[in-house]
A protein has these predicted regions:
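Bacterial N-terminal signal peptides
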Residues: 7-16
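Positively charged n-region of N-terminal signal peptides that target proteins for export
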Residues: 1-7
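N-terminal signal peptide c-region/cleavage motif recognized by signal peptidases
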Residues: 18-20
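C-terminal His-loop and adjacent cap/lid subdomain of alpha/beta-hydrolase
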Residues: 24-555
Length: 555
């Protein structure tokens, strides 16, 4: 080889190595490989294998590819100056990959839980562990994805998911400052009787307390988000330990449904935004690499067939995760390759996830009663480019950089009342309809509710009215097929079908009238979507503004 050519080759090699070092999976550890569904044959695809293990990766904290990750510069580094992490992985793939359809179907975990069994496969098991530890023929439900030949992948992204029930998590580093874990004053909202049991004496905090000195903390309570906060006297509560508080005298229970808030000095925050990079880099590895640094084969490439396309699916928190993933530019990997060609976000409304923030709390979600003052709904909302007068910003969820996925978003009636779903197709002021890009579709699955799935009954649970038992499953399955054809064949799905201002089907909540029905509780109004207030240092001057002067809201 002539010297100029050799020099050029070496330079290109150096660039490739540098690019690979920015963000990548370094090790795949396979813990178990076993037949899935007791060896059942799914049509022409045949039987499936169940693969579990751990993926380890590393990130360059100074790479432009990772610059959007909050506090990554504060994470400990290895000898190469890289930030390390690891995530649980779970794969269901055709035993003979050549008989699969070449599509990787990545489901984003919801608080560490798998959900496609209930959302797509009509699995009616009541215990989360039943679908989280999918093994048997019953766990395959109707077999929809398997009969179509998908390779299904899950991986952890949240380091603080509840343990047990076979949940999947992530090992992420703690943010450090001056050689010690970062510490800040944070606001913790506490409510029992809905998302957590009311029969508890002590409640767990999202982060350990840097100090359990009550003189440096404050606990308040109110019945509703719109009520003024009432301070709980210091002698009426205490830190049970660094990670929990309880009321005094001992044995006193928190009032169910009431909103308690604790302002305290917290510490040991994980660098949560790494979870997004872990998804990006794992799927990129499974699509494009043959083996890890130790020579362990890519479990999707070792037997032939391989992955030609990748799509992602998520419902509720997981759907918001996908919207946030797009906004952060995570669909472009370190080698400038697209990660997912298609995405499907269900019941995400207009929100994202409180997960790329200092002292973030990914499990928070803005609903009718609680978690109103945490980051979830921030501009941009729509894939269409528009102006937000509240923030003074212009923009769109899509980045327009050539790496945006084909996107399908579906919502139910719940998300229009509680999650700002109209903001996907109207401007932030709610004044006009938007024209969405050709690569974006939005649908309302009318007559269904946020947690709709097969096997629901109408018992009210924590709600005032009976639960809507209607399942959106048939519509979701049809749209999965539509996304598949869009990605693989270029066949576009039907046009978006949503309420619109121009047609008079999208109206102010105050204009929606329903006659009184005996025994039926009617909503007092819409769940207004406003910009998030501060949750750290201090508790937020705008919190006081909201209580005394009102707050601007999105249309």
């Amino acid at each position: 080889m002539p010297r100029p050519a050799l020099a050029f080759a070496l330079a290109v090699g150096a660039i490739a190595v540098a690019g690979a070092a920015q963000a990548r999976i370094t090790e795949i550890r396979i813990d178990a490989v076993a037949p899935f569904a007791e060896g059942h044959s799914f049509g022409e695809v045949g039987s499936y294998l169940r693969i579990t293990g751990v993926a380890k990766g590393e990130l360059d904290p100074f790479s432009p590819q990772n610059k959007m990750i909050v506090d990554l510069d504060k994470a400990p580094r290895n000898a190469r100056g890289m930030v390390e992490y690891e995530v649980d992985i779970f794969v269901l793939r055709p035993a003979d990959p050549a008989r699969g359809n070449g599509l990787l179907f990545y489901e984003v975990l919801n608080r560490g839980n798998k959900q496609i069994g209930q959302r797509l496969h009509d699995f009616v098991g009541s215990e989360a562990a039943s679908q989280n530890d999918a093994r048997t023929r019953a766990h395959a439900g109707n077999g929809f994805l398997f009969e179509r030949g998908y390779t299904v992948v899950w991986s952890g992204w949240d380091p603080d998911v509840a343990k047990g029930n076979a949940t999947m998590g992530a090992g992420l580093p703690v943010a450090m400052e001056d050689g010690r874990p970062l510490a800040r004053r944070v606001r913790e909202e506490i409510q029992v009787g809905k998302r957590r049991s009311a029969d508890v004496e002590a409640v767990r905090l999202s982060y350990p307390a840097a100090s359990t000195d009550r003189s440096r903390a404050q606990l308040t309570v109110r019945a509703r988000a719109s009520d003024p906060r009432v301070v709980v006297p210091p002698q009426e509560w205490e830190f049970a330990d660094a990670r929990s508080i309880r009321l005094l005298p001992r044995g006193t229970r928190f009032t169910p449904i009431s909103i308690y808030e604790l302002w305290y000095e917290a510490t040991e925050p994980k660098v949560l935004g790494i979870g997004f990079a872990a998804t990006r880099d794992l799927v990129s590895f499974l699509r494009y690499e043959r083996a890890d640094d130790r020579g362990t084969a890519n479990p999707l490439a070792e037997a032939g067939g391989g992955v030609r396309h990748a799509v992602a699916f998520g419902g509720s928190q997981s759907g918001r995760y996908l919207r946030h993933f797009i906004e952060l530019g995570m669909n472009k990997d370190a080698q400038a390759r697209r990660v997912f060609e298609g995405m499907f976000a269900h019941t995400a409304g207009a929100g994202k996830v409180f997960a790329n923030h200092s002292f973030g709390q990914p499990g928070r979600t803005f609903t009718q009663h609680e978690d109103h003052d945490y980051p979830e709904n921030w501009f941009p909302f729509s894939t269409a480019y528009t102006l937000d007068k509240l923030s003074g910003k212009t923009g769109a969820l899509f980045r327009g950089d050539g790496f945006d996925p084909l996107l399908i978003e579906t919502n139910t009636s719940t998300e229009y009342w509680q999650k700002g779903a109209s903001l996907l197709t109207t401007d932030p002021a709610g004044a006009r309809d938007l024209s969405l890009p050709e690569s974006s579709r939005v649908y309302l699955i009318a007559g269904t509710q946020h947690g709709g799935r097969a096997g629901l009954d109408s018992r009210p649970g924590a709600c005032a009215n009976p639960t809507n038992p209607m399942s959106p499953g048939p519509a979701l399955r049809a749209l999965v097929v539509a996304l598949e054809q869009w990605v693989t064949k270029g066949i576009a799905p039907p046009p978006s079908r949503v309420p619109s201002i121009s047609a008079g089907t999208a109206v102010e909540y105050a204009d929606v009238r329903m006659p009184p029905v005996k025994g039926l509780a009617l909503p007092h109004g819409g769940n207004l979507i406003g910009p998030p207030v501060d949750w750290i240092n201090p508790p937020g001057a705008r919190t006081e503004i909201r209580e005394t002067q009102g707050e601007p809201f999105y249309g």
